[in-house]
Amino acid sequence: MEVKRTKGVLKRIAGPVVTAVNLDAHMYDVVKVGDEQLMGEVIKIKGEDIIIQVYEDTSGIKPGEPVENTGLSLSVELGPGLLTSIYDGIQRPLEVLVEKMGNFIERGVTAPGLSHDKKWEFKPIKKAGDMVTPGTIIGEVQETNIVHKIMVPPYCDAGKIKDIKSGSFTIDEIICTLDNGAEIAMMHKWPVRMPRPVTEKLNPDIPLITGQRILDGLFPVAKGGTAAIPGPFGSGKTVTQQALAKWSDAEIVVYIGCGERGNEMTEVLTEFPELEDPKTGRPLMERTVLIANTSNMPVAAREASVYTGITIAEYFRDMGYDVSLMADSTSRWAEAMREISSRLEEMPGEEGYPAYLAARLSEFYERAGRVNTLNKDFGSVTVIGAVSPPGGDFSEPVTQNTLRIVKCFWALDAKLSQRRHFPAINWLNSYSLYLDTLSQYYDENVSPEWNPLRTWAMEVLQKEAELQEIVQLVGSDALPDEEQVTIEVARMLREIFLQQNAFDPVDTYCDMTKQFDILKAIRFYSDQAYAALKAGVITSQITGLKAKNDLPQIKYVKEYKPEIERIVKTMESEFTKLREAA
């Protein structure tokens, strides 16, 4: 009988990539490297050579040190205690690590992803004799104000419940046994690289309401959709991501800081626990899982952090929740792939990125979706990935490959951010391919006028862009009267509708009804202005209308309805006077 070699020795070390020999291993097995037991993962097997990427700093380890195979693939612990947690890329809770070793993470330290000592109150919703299948929800735990649903792990066989308990248990204790011998605890493990199974994927036809006018109004993303936010440095990617994490109508938010600046992660870690969830008034952190993996942490862990995040998101989706996952930024993950690929001496592709860049990106984004879960509930994972192209160049491989996969593209523009136009999303370069599938939702839930209004707004903004070249050459006064009005209406759309103050308590979130009312008021001004032109009113009188100057203040008024009605009435009477005078 062949003896399984679980211990080998190090032969070669090249930064985060090490080679071991005399070791039996499968692809993606987790191994412990060196005397300090650093965590690594098998990424290539070449004859006797086992090539491992190490998730911790390898300085100081030398050839000849032992390598031990755990025989397990990289997995996350899924169960009560996930919400409010702050993890590093390999699901080590940072709060536990601080207690173990202070503010700086030492090497070779492990900590379980969930607390194995804390007791949770388990309420069964199934009883003995009930038939259960993989993914069936058998009970509930009130974790925060969110109910954590305990399910039969997807790898378990179907069977009848033999015994199910009620009361306080730790996540390791058996709470349910099936007649086929399966024992179910509140926690189960799942390999991060394997998508969790579902009954079927559904057409994403419900929008993710974000409260950001430019996103909901012009470029909506569906629940279960994918969106990319590319943009150069300082254009507001992280602020946009954080606004989405705070305000989007997803029930759970998973925020992955993947290779971003440490200070930005610090901001998230200090801000999120203090922020209030606008829907419940509870701390926002109670529906959030944070994965902090800053740029000075080992590069290999960036890949792990992305997979860890999406696996946790899929777990909550399987409970029937709508989850939004923010990955900030996927470019750093791609750079980590490039570094490891070059250490492996693989043939480089475009700009040095590996040839499998597109495959890895699509593997990640394709795990998004609105689904019918194994428990026959509806859940969704919406993935919003930030991309940081060097120098703001959208033609580089990461941006281009991401564009091929995602259906919603929010292009951030440094020029807009320099003009202090926030969110700095360029309405000419951005697009959403969800408009057709979402139009029915808007007709039924906002107004049948919504879709024509949106189309009109986009046409005005495009027309303004075409006229801008002439304006820069000869000035707006040289344009025909109609086009001068078009430029004024476009300015109103930009300054009143598209600009939004993320730091104003009212304007930071704008619901769909208010968005519709603001657009309708601008459209009303536009229609009246063209009618006045035909009646012979001069352009300067139309653009100098007093009532329209009150419109921008609507954004900052909570109970805005009476105010907007007053402005529209005043506008109407002013236009009537102008027409009569003409």
UniProtKB/Swiss-Prot annotation:
Molecular-function annotations in GO: ATP binding; ATP hydrolysis activity; proton-transporting ATP synthase activity, rotational mechanism; proton-transporting ATPase activity, rotational mechanism
Q: How does it sit in the membrane?
A: Peripheral membrane protein
Q: Name one GO cellular component term.
A: plasma membrane
* Listed CDD domains: ATP-synt_V_A-type_alpha_C, V_A-ATPase_A
User: Does the record carry DNA-binding as a key word?
Assistant: no
Highest taxon, organism lineage: Archaea
Question: Which UniProt keywords are listed?
Answer: ATP synthesis, ATP-binding, Cell membrane, Hydrogen ion transport, Ion transport, Membrane, Nucleotide-binding, Translocase, Transport
Looking up SMART domains in the UniProt record yields: AAA (SM00382)
Enzyme class, broadest EC rank: translocase
Reaction catalysed by this enzyme: ATP + H2O + 4 H(+)(in) = ADP + phosphate + 5 H(+)(out)
Give a GO biological-process term.
proton motive force-driven plasma membrane ATP synthesis
Which InterPro entries does the entry link to?
AAA+_ATPase (IPR003593), ATP-synt_VA_C (IPR055190), ATP-synth_a_Xtn (IPR031686), ATP_synth_asu-like_sf (IPR023366), ATP_synth_asu_arc (IPR005726), ATPase_a/bsu_AS (IPR020003), ATPase_F1/V1/A1_a/bsu_N (IPR004100), ATPase_F1/V1/A1_a/bsu_N_sf (IPR036121)
Query: A Pfam family for this UniProt protein?
Result: ATP-synt_VA_C
Give the residues the record marks as binding ATP: 231-238
Protein family (similarity comment): Belongs to the ATPase alpha/beta chains family.
**Quaternary organization:** Has multiple subunits with at least A(3), B(3), C, D, E, F, H, I and proteolipid K(x).
Q: What does this protein do?
A: Component of the A-type ATP synthase that produces ATP from ADP in the presence of a proton gradient across the membrane. The A chain is the catalytic subunit.
Concerning PANTHER family, the annotation shows: H(+)-TRANSPORTING TWO-SECTOR ATPASE, V-TYPE PROTON ATPASE CATALYTIC SUBUNIT A
NCBIfam families, A to Z: ATP_syn_A_arch, PRK04192.1
Q: What is this protein called?
A: A-type ATP synthase subunit A 1
| Natural source organism | Methanospirillum hungatei JF-1 (strain ATCC 27890 / DSM 864 / NBRC 100397 / JF-1)
Taxonomy of origin reads: Archaea, Methanobacteriati, Methanobacteriota, Stenosarchaea group, Methanomicrobia
